[in-house]
């Protein structure tokens, strides 16, 4: 008879193994479906891949997208793929196309891979996995990083561009010829509370700027300690920040650039113009 303590340890071990297997299965981001070459071409064009880019393909399969980025645009690239046989196939393809010095293929979980180096991210994953990546993209990727998602949007994030096309050869692969590409530019992280400084001619007192930033919306208000004044039509694209403000009857237009915990730029109003600065305090 197996002692109770040993049986309990064995049961715990089996449970842990089963849990690990379940977690690994949960992170298999869909079956391998090769992207037709015409779509590879359009994804690279939409991302405006350049020689100074580092292109990450999450779920890279046979590596064709990363290899094409290196061969056609001299970009560097990283492919992340869970299946070892596909990783080896991609490495062989890189050697054959003479770009092995510019690309690397990593066997690993794309949900745990460090992606901070990327300036371009490509993905062709099932919707539930795409949505899991949205918080990571917004939190970890540098402002200005471009993302192209094949067929599935990064909900609830709104794309900067969309491209639709009919690709007959895709029907034999995935059952449909209709293709959609979604293009995103990672915005600077501007949410929080800021000390806002304006020219004295526009605001004589210190102001507080409070910004709320979500994947599908950004906005906020300015407070002088007594009254709140809401921002108008705020947009954040890469590091570029724009918004309007009606402050005590004076309509002002702000343009600027975010850099970490500081922002600065120009402000215009009928009564004058000048520069503005902001420093994040929390």
Language-model-derived ranges and their functions:
Residues 19-53, 84-117:
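S-adenosyl-L-methionine
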């Amino acid at each position: 008879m197996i002692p109770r303590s040993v049986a309990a340890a064995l049961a715990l071990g089996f449970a842990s193994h089963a849990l690990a297997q379940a977690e690994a299965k949960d992170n298999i981001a869909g079956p391998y479906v090769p992207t037709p070459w015409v779509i590879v071409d359009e994804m690279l064009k939409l991302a405006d891949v350049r020689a100074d880019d580092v292109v990450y393909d999450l779920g890279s399969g046979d590596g064709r997208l990363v290899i094409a980025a290196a061969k056609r645009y001299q970009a560097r690239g990283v492919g992340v793929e869970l299946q070892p046989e596909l990783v080896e196939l991609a490495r062989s393809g890189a050697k054959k196309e003479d770009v092995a010095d510019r690309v690397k293929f990593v066997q690993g979980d794309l949900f745990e891979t460090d992606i901070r180096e990327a300036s371009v991210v490509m993905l062709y994953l099932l919707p539930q996995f795409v949505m899991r990546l949205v918080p990571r993209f917004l939190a970890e990727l540098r402002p200005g990083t471009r993302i192209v998602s094949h067929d599935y949007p990064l909900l609830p994030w709104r794309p900067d561009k969309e491209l639709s096309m009919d690709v007959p050869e895709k029907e034999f692969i995935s059952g449909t010829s209709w293709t959609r590409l979604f293009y995103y530019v990672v915005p600077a992280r501007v949410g929080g509370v800021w000390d806002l400084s304006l020219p004295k001619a526009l605001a004589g007192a210190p102001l507080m700027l409070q910004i709320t930033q979500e994947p599908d919306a950004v906005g906020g208000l300015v407070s002088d300690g007594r009254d709140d004044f809401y921002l108008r039509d705020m947009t954040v694209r890469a590091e570029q920040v724009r918004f309007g403000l009606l402050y005590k009857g004076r309509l002002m237009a702000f343009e600027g650039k975010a850099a970490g915990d500081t922002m600065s730029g120009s402000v215009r109003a009928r009564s004058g113009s000048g520069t503005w600065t902001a420093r994040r305090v929390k």
